[in-house]
Swiss-Prot record:
It is an enzyme of class 6 (ligase). It comes from Ruegeria pomeroyi (strain ATCC 700808 / DSM 15171 / DSS-3) (Silicibacter pomeroyi). The gene is proS. It comes from the Bacteria. This is Proline--tRNA ligase. InterPro entries: aa-tRNA-synt_IIb (IPR002314), aa-tRNA-synth_II (IPR006195), aa-tRNA-synth_II/BPL/LPL (IPR045864), Anticodon-bd (IPR004154), Anticodon-bd_dom_sf (IPR036621), Pro-tRNA-ligase_IIa (IPR002316), Pro-tRNA-synth_IIa_bac-type (IPR004500), Pro-tRNA_synthetase (IPR050062). NCBIfam families: PRK12325.1, proS_fam_II. Catalyzes the attachment of proline to tRNA(Pro) in a two-step reaction: proline is first activated by ATP to form Pro-AMP and then transferred to the acceptor end of tRNA(Pro).
Length: 464
């Protein structure tokens, strides 16, 4: 993309309404614009990151054997009355009456709707286990929306629901989701710690929240410092293996890590003092096992092996996709702007032309742009007639991990400058070497990269 043709309304000054870093930088970088309190328009740069996160979530869900679908934002109030939860959400639920006088609501979650779908189409234990999920916009009427997309009223969320014949099968689904979520967050450059938590109005017997440590987090958390040393990395996990999923679950949850709602001071004090930590955390996901809490009152049963009807065991699993962007920025920024992890950056590399209009510099930038595009990367070429300082400031603000700087002086020596946004370190390379270096950096994140042929055309959702 050429910046002269892109819509990137960056702000030079810090917006007065922004209280935390992620909100301030998302507004300044032209990622979002507030439509009303807690509701945002996603501008091209922000939407591009949102789409990348969504695709990572889809890829990891499908890898775990989960099936994508899509449910509506508007739901019937009757389903919520049937489950007994219609009044539990209080004023956070946006209630609507249509022209026929039917009570409806803008869904804050989807347990009732998915249970209704299940009971209408699944009747035998032979159709289990089953895990369905979707990514959809939600609405919760927060009394004080703040912190930008971190605590908005409208947000994009992944909901997954498993249906199993037995508690043991449902707990395997719980562990499978935990593994899948950890891998998802690691691909996004985040360390999200699973912590024992409270189930809230969703209910259930077992639940873990995934929290990213950050000073601006809304939750107080208590943990053993050794928990931050654990990584899943490139380990291959068989999601059908009960033992493998349980082993990962135990590895990541055996050390003390809890939110303030479930914190046990006596147990915490048994940890060696030098390893005890308390901090703030941003919740980016949660998994639940709630047994037959919804299936029994709503009649979601299957015919068991003995021919008798039995209520299915269920679980619910959510990732706050739009909130993740705020969490990533809170965890990865400096005083100049955002520093995107390579797995989620909106563009893979920036190209800065120090002397727009110079024939040699223009040609070199065009060649770099074409070469990077041909191997499947997305460069952002700043071809505006702006001062070099302004171009560098824009690149630093929007946080692309790598920048190639092209100028007449370097080209006389046959080199361009490749700069890391994270470290600020620069190296002079030939244009061909710079392209190869960037391609090598992104190869682990993009196995489809080609050194010879352009990337094939892609659909809007790469998971389709």
């Amino acid at each position: 993309m050429r910046l002269s043709r892109y819509f990137l309304p960056v702000l030079k000054e810090n917006p007065a309404e922004a209280q935390i870093v992620s909100h301030r930088l998302m507004l300044r970088a032209g990622m979002i614009k507030q439509a009303q309190a807690g509701i945002y328009s996603w501008l091209p740069l922000g939407f591009k990151v949102l789409r990348k996160l969504e695709n990572i979530v889809h890829e990891e869900q499908i890898r775990a054997g989960h099936i994508p679908m899509l449910m509506p934002t508007l739901q019937s109030a009757d389903l919520w009355r049937e489950s007994g939860r219609y009044d539990d959400y209080g004023q956070e639920m946006l209630r609507i009456t249509d022209r026929h006088g039917r009570d409806m609501l803008f869904g804050p979650t989807n347990e009732e709707l998915i249970t209704d779908i299940f009971r209408g189409h699944v009747s035998s234990y032979k159709d289990l286990p089953l895990t369905l999920y979707h990514i959809q916009w939600k609405f919760r009427d927060e009394i004080r929306p703040r912190f930008g997309v971190m605590r908005g009223r409208e947000f994009l969320m992944k909901d997954g629901y498993n249906f199993d014949l037995t508690k043991e099968d449902a707990l395997h689904a719980y562990n499978r989701h935990l593994v899948s979520y950890i891998r998802t967050y690691e691909r996004m450059g985040l360390q999200a710690i699973p912590m024992r938590a409270d189930s809230g109005p969703i209910g259930g017997d077992d639940t873990h929240e995934f929290l990213v440590l950050a000073e601006t987090g809304e939750s107080e958390v208590f943990y053993d410092s050794k928990v931050t040393d654990i990584r899943l990395g490139e380990r291959e996990i068989d999601y059908d293996s009960v033992d493998q999923c349980r082993a990962v679950m135990e590895e990541f949850t055996s050390l003390y890590a809890r939110t303030d709602e479930t914190h046990d001071e006596a147990v915490f004090n048994q940890i060696p003092e030098e390893r005890r930590r308390s901090a703030r955390g941003i919740e980016v996901g949660q998994i639940f096992y709630f047994g037959t809490k919804y299936s029994e009152p709503m009649g979601a049963t299957v015919q068991g092996p003995d021919g008798k009807p039995v209520p299915v065991h269920m679980g619910s699993h959510g990732i706050g996709v739009s909130r993740l962007i705020g969490a990533i920025i809170e965890a990865s920024h400096d005083d100049k702007g955002i520093i995107w992890p390579e797995g989620v950056t909106p563009f893979h590399c920036g190209i800065v032309n120090l002397k727009q209009g110079d024939g040699e510099a223009d040609a070199a930038c065009d060649q770099l742009y074409a070469a990077l595009s041909a191997i499947g990367l997305e460069p952002l070429y700043d071809d505006r007639n702006e001062r070099a300082g302004g171009k560098f400031a824009t690149m630093d603000l929007i946080g692309l991990p790598w920048r190639i700087t092209v100028g007449p002086r370097g080209l006389k020596n046959g080199v361009v400058e490749l700069t890391s946004r994270k470290t600020g370190e620069s190296v002079e390379l030939s244009p061909e070497e710079a392209v190869k270096k960037v391609a090598d950096i992104y190869a682990p994140h993009h196995p489809h990269l080609s050194r010879e042929e352009p990337m094939a055309g892609r659909s809007f959702h790469t998971w389709l």
